[in-house]
Structures are given as C-alpha cells and as structure tokens.
Design a protein with these regions (language model features):
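Beta-strand-rich binding/interaction modules
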Residues: 513-522
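Loop/helix patches that line or flank the sugar-binding groove of alpha-linked glycan CAZymes
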Residues: 4-7, 210-215, 220-223, 233-245, ...
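Short, polar loop/linker segments at the starts of domains and inter-domain junctions
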Residues: 20-34, 291, 335-340, 428-434
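Acidic/aromatic-lined carbohydrate-recognition and catalytic surfaces
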Residues: 2-183, 187, 200-260, 267, ...
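Residue-level marker for buried hydrophobic side chains located in beta-strands
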Residues: 92, 193, 362-363, 505
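Hydrophobic residues within beta-strands of alpha/beta enzymes
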Residues: 45, 193-195
Length: 522
C-alpha cells in the first residue's frame, strides 16, 4: 500500500452555521471557527458548505461556487482561516456539492428561460408523458423527482429538493465549469474536499420507469442509480483533471456503490482518498421512511463494523464516523438506556477512533452531545425532517408517532448549536440562535468538561494522542483490525496488529463485569 500524507491524520467536521457565532446574528461564522482552532487540536477540518446559497438545504444548494455566503463572513476571513490553520499544521477541506446546484444559480435561471437552449443542457429537462412526469422516480427527500416548468411541457430532474436541480455530467461544458471551479479552490490552498452525493452523477438517460415500491405509485430514485453503469469513468476524469494534480485529500459520500467497486473507489489509485463507512447508518433505514426505521444494537454494530473493516483491509482506508450533520447523534442512536452516560459515550468513541482508517469526529461528539426533542414539527428547520414527517402522516401514523420518528432520526439533532458553556444560548451566540439550543446544555458543555479531567472531552484527547504517539502511530495507522471474542455477548473487542506490534481494544457494553482470557486468544 502506498503511504500518503493524510495517513494517520484525525479529522473534525465543523457545521459552521452551528459552531460559533461572533457577531450576534444567531448564525455561526468563519470568525468563530478561527477563534477555536486551538481548541480542536486535530489535523484536518472539514467545513460543511459555506458557499453562497439560499439555504433551502442548509447550503447544499449552491447559487455561486466562487463566493462565501455573507452569513458566514468574507473571502478575506476564509483566507485568514487557511493561513491560521497552516500555522498549526492543520488542513482545511471543503464540502464539494457537484451533483446539483441551487435553482437560484445563474445557470439554472438561464435554463428556465430556454429549456431547449445551451443552459437547458446544463441540466436534465425532459417533456412529460401524457400530462405526467417523465418517469415515476421519488426523490431522496420525498415526492416526485421531476418538477414541472410552469407554462411549458418540460420537467427538470432533482434527486433531492426541487430547489436542487441535477447538473448534466454528460455535457463537457458543465464538466469544464466544475473542474475550473475545483482547481480555483485548490489553488487558493484548500487541501481537499468531502464530496457530496457523488455516486448520483451518472444517470440512465432513458429514465425508465420501475415497479412502484410505495402507495404513492413511485419508486425510490436510487433504483435508477443502482441500475446504471459507467460512473467510474466520470469519477476518474474528475480526479485526473483536479485532485490528482494537487495530491488533494478527498473523502466521498457514497451510498449506492456496487460491491465489486471498492478498490476502484479507494484503492491505491482509486477515485478518492477514502470514503465514509455508512454501514451502521444504513442498518437503520426503514422500508418506507423514518417512521419504520430500525433500531441498531451493539451486536449489529459489531457485525457491520468488522465486515466493513475486513472488506477494506487490503484495499484502502475508510473514514470512520459515529455521527455527522446528516444523522442523529450517535450517543442517542446506538447506546442502550443503561449506557446513556459518559462511560457509554467513551466506549463508543473508543470503538470508532481506534479502528483502522481516518477518524472523523463531528462537532459536539467530543463532549457527548445528544439528540434534541423539538415540541412541534414547526420547530424543525431541516427540509428532510419536514418531508419525512409528512410521509409518516400520509402512511397513517399519528402525530405522536410521526414526531417520535423525527426525535430519533432528524438531521437537526446534529445541527443544534454547539454547547460551549452554561450561559444563555450555551455560549453559542449573544443573539437568537437560528435553531433551538438543546436544553441539556447546562449539564453538557465544553467549559464544564475542560474543568474535569475524567470528562468525555479529555478522553477523546487521550484517544487521539495515543493514535498519534511515536510508540503506537504505526500500528494504529497501518495495523490490521483482528476481531476478538466475536461470539462473546457484551464484548466489542479487536486487536490492531502489525508484524512487530499488537494492541488490544476491549470494551464491555453489558450491564455486568466480564472476564476474558487474553492468553488463549488468537
């Protein structure tokens, strides 16, 4: 395996809108990130989108790829962030959203005026069939994936929200626009990108109908993605025109990859440096939506994590996560009631951070932030939460049942403001926060944990220091994961092993003390 500059690094995801507000407008900003660089003490910072956007989907609907949205600050402040990070040997990676853009982007506004013209071919405009959409796809956010252009026979494709039209990756002009933009950011000093929803860029241009999978008569658009070949050619072209030139670090968000494509994606010469391991998250998916989402226990977690590690051990590195901006808090999702405490959170952190791969820690994870129960669906900001609530109600759920699904699965669970201290609004802002602060901030906050050496925050610091220590960095970076005591109830254990060194990671997630025999284990 080729050794890369990013091997052995630890990453931290910042959701800027909820990280730290420094001007009192209730929205986190770049100055807040700069002010806390020394707090982090990690190597790579992934910034969720800060581009100009109408924020229908919290910045994943970009209206100008070359501008910082004014709610976050200025390009000068971004340049300052790059410079300050460099002083600390830290790397900044940005979110790259190139499957789609905002319907407010100049390209799409021009396309609406002439769907059959030049800019119409930047997107997927198709005429309807007998007064219906071109095909029966349900978008990832619910409802038809086709939106009718008022006053015409045309519809446009949007795999996500209707305000996020899909870009046409079959158009060389679109590719040139995107490659130029990516290289502009890399020239500026960005170290790489987290690449959003990238598997979706390849479409079956015949847009065939599929057998409906729900009472709405539609089928999930993932069916089309799974049925089409050739995405690898697009991804390789993307890499060669951009990332490869800069030795950039790239981490892909991939859900629909085919089983035999792992090496192609993250091998030594793969399309990307790494990709997130979503195997635990995928186990929670319901057949019809959040309202029938599945519970995942530690026995399930053990199986899928070990399976993912085994598949990857001779191929490349995974990006290991417990939570991110698109998922509920890991402590709330994975820990049983009896482990809803700091010991349980430390256990979960140990399992994840010490695995082979790149640990990605999401803001607030290092202090054990939890899900936040909102009183009403109106209190949620997330577009997918509102859509899933409607899906649950349409399926016959009561308001209470639909709200319970949101409590457990909403993306807003991870987007509540960072809890810095026990002052008003958790020290996040002096104004009114854009999203509710979790009421538990009095008990769970950074200031309290920095004053207590047995806290979750200090424990995460110790895990990171151990991974990066001179004595152990080789085994924790390149050592294989060897599952241990797999059949023993209540134990989640594995070894990190090289030819010269073995380290045991053993956790007990039961209610009882358990004895294991290390002398007889293989």
């Amino acid at each position: 395996m080729k050794r890369k500059w990013w091997h052995g690094k630890v990453a931290y995801q910042i959701y800027p809108k909820s990280f730290q507000d420094t001007n009192g407008d209730g929205i986190g900003d770049l100055r807040g990130v700069i002010d806390h660089l020394d707090y982090l003490g990690i190597d790579i910072i992934w910034l969720s989108p800060i581009y100009q956007s109408p924020f229908v989907d919290q910045g994943y609907d970009i209206s100008d790829y070359y501008k910082i949205d004014e709610i976050f600050g200025t390009m000068e402040e971004f340049d300052e962030l790059l410079a300050e990070a460099k002083k600390r040997d830290m790397y900044i990676i940005m979110d790259l959203v190139i499957n789609h853009c905002s319907d407010q982007h100049e390209w799409f506004q021009k396309a609406l005026k002439d769907p059959a013209g030049k800019y119409g071919d930047y997107f997927y405009f198709r005429k309807g069939k007998d007064g219906n959409p071109p095909s029966n796809y349900r978008s990832y956010f619910g409802g038809s994936a086709w939106e009718k252009v008022e006053g015409t026979d045309y519809y446009y494709l949007h795999m996500f929200a209707k305000e996020q039209p899909d870009l046409n990756w079959n158009n060389p002009e679109v590719l040139n626009e995107l490659y130029t933009m990516i290289n502009w950011w890399l020239d500026k000093g960005v170290a790489g990108f987290r690449i959003d929803a990238i598997i979706n860029i390849k479409k079956d241009l015949s847009f065939p109908d599929y057998e409906p999978d729900g009472p709405d008569g539609m089928t999930g658009i993932f069916r089309m993605v799974e049925g089409v070949d050739g995405v690898g050619e697009l991804l390789e072209d993307l890499k060669k025109h951009t990332f490869e030139k800069y030795d950039a670090f790239t981490v892909a968000e991939v859900f629909n990859m085919k089983k035999d494509e792992l090496e192609e994606f993250i091998g030594d010469d793969g399309h990307f440096s790494t990709m997130f391991d979503f195997s635990a998250h995928e186990m929670t998916f319901g057949d019809h939506g959040w309202y029938d989402a599945k519970k995942v226990g530690f026995d399930d977690l053990k199986k899928v994590i070990f399976h993912a590690q085994k598949e990857c051990e001779d191929v490349g590195f995974l990006a290991n996560i417990i939570e991110n901006h698109d998922e509920p808090r890991g402590a709330s999702r994975y820990l049983p009631d009896y482990l809803q405490n700091e010991d349980g959170i430390k256990l979960l952190g140990t399992i994840s951070v010490m695995l082979r791969g790149i640990p990605f820690i999401y803001q607030g994870q290092e202090i054990g932030m939890r899900n936040c129960h909102m009183a009403s669906i109106d209190d949620y900001n997330d577009i997918s939460t509102k859509n899933e609530y409607a899906v649950a109600i349409d399926a016959g759920c009561t308001v209470e049942e639909a709200m319970e699904a949101c409590y457990e699965n909403s993306r807003d669970n991870a987007r509540t403001p960072m809890q810095w201290d026990d002052s008003a609004q958790a020290g996040f802002t002096t104004g009114t926060p854009w999203l509710f602060v979790n009421p538990n901030y009095k008990e769970i906050n950074v200031k309290e944990q920095l004053g207590r050496e047995d806290s979750v925050w200090y424990y995460y610091q110790k895990l990171i220091a151990l991974r990066k220590s001179e004595d152990y960095k080789e085994v924790f970076t390149y050592g294989k994961v060897v599952p241990m005591f797999v059949e023993k109830d209540g134990i989640f254990a594995y070894a990190r092993k090289t030819e010269d060194q073995t380290v045991y990671i053993i956790t007990n997630y039961s209610r009882e003390d358990i004895t294991v025999d290390l002398l007889t284990t293989n």
